């Protein structure tokens, strides 16, 4: 059965419950009206993008039990919030259970997530595992612990998913995370590899989904502020930040400011791969390629540089301007 798509009616309804002014409140000022309008657009956009991603990749199906991994950060809060809204209007039935892994980091506020989850009325499970001590014992002081911590966390969450009978594991990675991963793998790993919106886990037993795949991080930051989620800091472990990922994040933010549409184009390119124009012999049979003698309108242009966009293509609103290819005579 198809995954849930958001329609206009559902998107219109996906605003804050308290967005409407209480009876007897003075009329909103023009500034307040503009802010309310922009906030409403933000809510609709995020819900629409999550619904679209779910539908495009068939992330959630009839009868699924979705385990939403909740860390206490803005992304996982937003993911849970939007999935609960979508479930109310989806054409299929599916269950949601929120799961938090308490890794016994010093200063972690154990009461915050249970109180929040009880308030919103969603079933939840808190898994208590002291991975913090393991990581501190194995990783030298001052080194980044994120890689080992992630591996330990992944294995625990896979086990918990099986124990809870979850059919899908939902993670809160967003558009910027996906582009950052692509750049990290290109710059430091020498490979074209991103972060898929849906995958089979390495243990072969779980399907992992990323419903926020189409959502910008800046939108999630605004959403979390407006929804007033009880955010838990992500640096309680005392680990050094991942400097390479921080570098990619800063680069993407700078591009978004200076070259509107560039990051969107990079993200969209991940869904428009042309293996015949790359160099991976496992994806395209270059070695056995022979001339067929028949013209192909979609064939390669061997001698001319291909422009970034044809002159007939209308640029999407906010998209980066295509780069013109200028030919120079040999000197």
Curated annotation (Swiss-Prot):
One of its GO terms (cellular component) is cytoplasm. GO terms for biological process: tRNA thio-modification. Pfam families: ATP_bind_3. Its main location: cytoplasm. [4Fe-4S] cluster binds at residues 146, 149, 237. The thiolation reaction likely consists of two steps: a first activation step by ATP to form an adenylated intermediate of the target base of tRNA, and a second nucleophilic substitution step of the sulfur (S) atom supplied by the hydrosulfide attached to the Fe-S cluster. This is tRNA-cytidine(32) 2-sulfurtransferase.
């Amino acid at each position: 059965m198809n995954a849930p798509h958001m329609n206009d009616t559902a998107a219109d309804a996906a605003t804050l419950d308290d967005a409407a002014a209480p009876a007897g409140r003075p009329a909103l000022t023009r500034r307040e009206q503009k802010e309310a309008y922009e906030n409403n657009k933000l809510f609709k956009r995020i819900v629409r993008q999550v619904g679209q991603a779910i539908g495009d990749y068939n992330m959630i199906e009839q009868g699924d039990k979705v385990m939403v991994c909740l860390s206490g950060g803005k992304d996982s809060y937003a993911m849970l919030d939007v999935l609960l809204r979508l479930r109310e209007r989806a054409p299929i039935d599916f269950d949601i259970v929120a799961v938090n892994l308490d890794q016994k980091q010093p200063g972690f506020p154990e009461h915050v997530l249970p109180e929040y989850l009880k308030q919103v009325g969603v079933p939840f499970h808190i898994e208590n595992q002291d991975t913090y001590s393991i990581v501190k014992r194995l990783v030298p002081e001052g080194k980044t612990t994120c890689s080992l911590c992630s591996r330990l966390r992944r294995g625990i969450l896979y086990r918990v998913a099986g124990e809870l009978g979850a059919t899908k594991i939902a993670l809160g990675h967003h558009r910027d995370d996906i582009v950052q991963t692509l750049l990290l793998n290109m710059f430091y790993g020498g490979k074209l590899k991103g972060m898929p919106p849906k995958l089979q886990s390495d243990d072969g037993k779980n399907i992992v989904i990323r419903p926020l795949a189409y959502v910008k991080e800046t939108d999630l930051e605004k959403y979390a502020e407006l929804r007033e989620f009880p955010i838990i800091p992500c640096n309680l472990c005392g680990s050094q930040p991942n400097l390479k990922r921080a570098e990619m994040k800063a680069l993407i933010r700078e591009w978004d400011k200076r070259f509107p549409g560039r990051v969107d184009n990079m993200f969209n390119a991940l869904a428009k791969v042309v293996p015949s124009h790359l160099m991976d012999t496992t994806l395209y049979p270059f070695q056995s390629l022979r001339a067929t003698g028949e013209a192909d309108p979609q064939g390669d242009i061997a001698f001319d540089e291909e422009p970034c966009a044809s002159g007939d293509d209308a640029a999407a609103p906010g998209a980066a301007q295509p780069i013109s290819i200028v030919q120079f005579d040999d000197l």
